[in-house]
């Protein structure tokens, strides 16, 4: 270790290489109060990284829309003209490609929700509402709950999503699911495919509320009185898109809508759950109760991952999540530079895992079942049966 117990850059690179070669663990994140402040972290980032640009942000929207339009043309004009064997093989390629592109658009809408798209809040909200509604996401509803996630990351009592349970809070059948490879696989598939719509509709994996919580309910416990009117706007956006899909189904057929829109949307949901799950679930990440939690340590209890070529395609939401939690209004096109700038300041407090994503998903589903406290402290770590 370096001076003061800090991991040197060479030691960190060695650890990352070992992880990439198959090592199963990485060093736990420190849980002591950091020897640096948010202000010191911010000073390490070049000032231009915080500058938002309407033109640059819209260039990424145009990029994604052009690719999505080209793929739609491929689905509607080229696939039907292909001979049967190629015809059936081409549809899965379209679904996966279009799902990836639409997830990239989802990320742009997420930027809008953080006011990282432009200097104009109204413009951000209009762009975010249009993009998220087109993907069946209630924009303002999720914007507000997601803002609370950023305000309470790592808190067992107040975080909004992927809140781990203690061992005693799990259902009696949990050991039979997680200790069984088949059960574990089923759990992963269900979580990836149904997790997002269930979270929006019933708050699955979210923090407990005193009554039923739903992102579509303007009067639900997630929102305060100032936010309720915009929840109606979010619902109207989703309903408008739903009505448009209904009219398309009535004109072109139900299965046309499924092939062209619904299956790519399912891929979007899979990416969304996978990326967010892996950002906040790792054996090296702590959680805190009210005795220990503070905002900075909570914001640092996340991990950057390597998705290969998808990092840039997904606007680097995958490999710059730590800096995003520290400065959520920083635009994505500066996040890589900002991450490089803060790593020397964060030292051991910065977590990056290059483990291949499929392997990491299986490992986290096996190792991160519940959390247990350190003796005499309000610090909790993942454990398994």
Swiss-Prot record:
Q: What does this protein do?
A: Delta(12) fatty acid desaturase converting palmitoleic acid (16:1(9)) to hexadecadienoic acid (16:2(9,12)). No detectable Delta(12)linoleate desaturase activity. Involved in the biosynthesis of the aliphatic side chain of sorgoleone, a phytotoxic secondary metabolite playing a direct role in allelopathic interactions.
Q: Which PANTHER family match?
A: OMEGA-6 FATTY ACID DESATURASE, CHLOROPLASTIC
Domains (record comment): The histidine box domains may contain the active site and/or be involved in metal ion binding.
Task: Supply the name of the protein.
Answer: Fatty acid desaturase DES2
Q: Which residues cross the membrane?
A: 65-85, 89-109, 122-142, 185-205, 231-251, 254-274
Q: Which organism is it from?
A: Sorghum bicolor (Sorghum)
The UniProt GO MF terms for this protein read: oxidoreductase activity; oxidoreductase activity, acting on paired donors, with oxidation of a pair of donors resulting in the reduction of molecular oxygen to two molecules of water
Provide the alphabetized UniProt keywords. Answer: Fatty acid biosynthesis, Fatty acid metabolism, Lipid biosynthesis, Lipid metabolism, Membrane, Oxidoreductase, Transmembrane, Transmembrane helix
Family to which the UniProt record says this protein belongs:
Belongs to the fatty acid desaturase type 1 family.
